[in-house]
Amino acid sequence: MIGLRPAFSTMLFLLLLTGGVYPLLTTALGQWWFPWQANGSLIHKDNVIRGSALIGQSFTAAGYFHGRPSATADTPYNPLASGGSNLAASNPELDAQIQARVAALRAANPQASSAVPVELTTASASGLDNNLTPGAAAWQIPRVAAARQLPVEQVAQLVAEYTHRPLARFLGQPVVNIVELNLALDALQGHRAK
C-alpha cells in the first residue's frame, strides 16, 4: 500500500499539470500574443464573419477565383469532414476526377491558353486548402475580369496585392489566399458576384 502512494501522487500531479495548468497557460498565452490566430483567423467584413483565412470556401461563380477542389465528401470545404481523398496516383478513379475537372476548368476559362494548373485539379491533403500559387490565380484572371467587367490589369494588380510571400525563400513559396482575394473583389465593386 505504501508503494502506491508515490505513484498515485505523481499521477495526480501530472494530471493536474497536463490536463489543467498546461492547457490554461497555452490558451492564455495564445490569446495574449496571437489573439487573431488563437480565435481561428476569422475574417470580418461589415461586422459579419465572412470566413477564416485558414479554411477555403466553395466559390463557383464566374466572377470569383476558384480554389482547389475540396476532398470533403458531401459539402465542399466542410471542416468536420477534413481529409484527403486517399486515392493513389495510379487509381483510375482519381484520373477520371482530374480529367473531369480539367474539362470543367477549360469550359469555364476559354480565354486561358496555357495548361490548367495542377492545384486546380487536385485536392489538398486536408481538403480545405485556401491558398493557390500566384500562377494558378493568374490563370483565372481573364475569366474573373470578364465576369466582373473589370480591366485585366486591375484584377492582376489585386492578385499581386493579395500574394503572401514568405519571410525567406527557403520557408515556402508565395501563395494567394483565395478567400481574402474574393472578398477584396467584392469590396472593390461593392457587391457580391453572381
Curated annotation (Swiss-Prot):
It is found in: Cell inner membrane. InterPro entries: KdpC (IPR003820). The keyword Acetylation does not apply. The chain crosses the membrane at residues 12-34. GO terms for molecular function: ATP binding; P-type potassium transmembrane transporter activity. Keywords: ATP-binding, Cell inner membrane, Cell membrane, Ion transport, Membrane, Nucleotide-binding, Potassium, Potassium transport, Transmembrane, Transmembrane helix, Transport. It is a single-pass membrane protein. GO terms for cellular component: plasma membrane. Part of the high-affinity ATP-driven potassium transport (or Kdp) system, which catalyzes the hydrolysis of ATP coupled with the electrogenic transport of potassium into the cytoplasm. This subunit acts as a catalytic chaperone that increases the ATP-binding affinity of the ATP-hydrolyzing subunit KdpB by the formation of a transient KdpB/KdpC/ATP ternary complex. The system is composed of three essential subunits: KdpA, KdpB and KdpC. Belongs to the KdpC family. This is Potassium-transporting ATPase KdpC subunit. It comes from Salmonella choleraesuis (strain SC-B67). The gene is kdpC.
